[in-house]
From Swiss-Prot:
Family matches, as Gene3D superfamilies: Regulatory phage protein Cox
Any Pfam family the entry gives: Phage_Cox
Organism expressing this protein natively: Escherichia phage P2 (Bacteriophage P2)
Family stated for the protein in its record: To phage HP1 cox.
Name of this protein: Regulatory protein cox
Key words, A-Z: DNA-binding, Early protein, Repressor, Transcription, Transcription regulation
S-S bonds: none
Keyword Transferase in annotation: no
GO molecular function: DNA binding
Job description of the protein: Repressor of the Pc promoter which controls gene C, which codes for the immunity repressor, and int, whose product promotes the site-specific recombination over att.
Lineage, top ranks: Viruses, Duplodnaviria, Heunggongvirae, Uroviricota, Caudoviricetes
InterPro entries: Cox_sf (IPR038147), Phage_P2_Cox (IPR019679)
């Protein structure tokens, strides 16, 4: 049986997100720097700069983006895997 990931929060540190998607923390940090991830920049009200230096990935936005990307694919590509299960329509 495969493992199921259950999270009790909508945001996780980018280092944990890297583990979830099988990428290095450096790769995920570069994705953040290029604006490719929905992140929350944690702030420290006690700090002079206001920045805590922590990025957390907002999972609902990530999941919505993946769903949109998947559903935007052409039907024959998006549903092609169903053919292998005998559930898709023949081309």
């Amino acid at each position: 049986m495969s493992k199921q990931v259950t999270l009790m929060t909508d945001a996780i540190p980018y280092q944990e997100f890297a583990k979830l998607i099988g990428k290095s923390t450096g790769a995920v940090r570069r994705m953040i720097d290029k604006g490719k991830l929905p992140v929350i920049d944690m702030t420290d009200p006690q700090s002079a700069s206001g920045r805590a230096g922590e990025y957390w990935v907002y999972l609902p936005a990530w999941n919505n983006g993946l769903k949109l990307a998947y559903e935007s694919r052409p039907k024959e590509i998006r549903d092609g895997w169903l053919m292998w299960l005998g559930l898709g329509e023949p081309r």
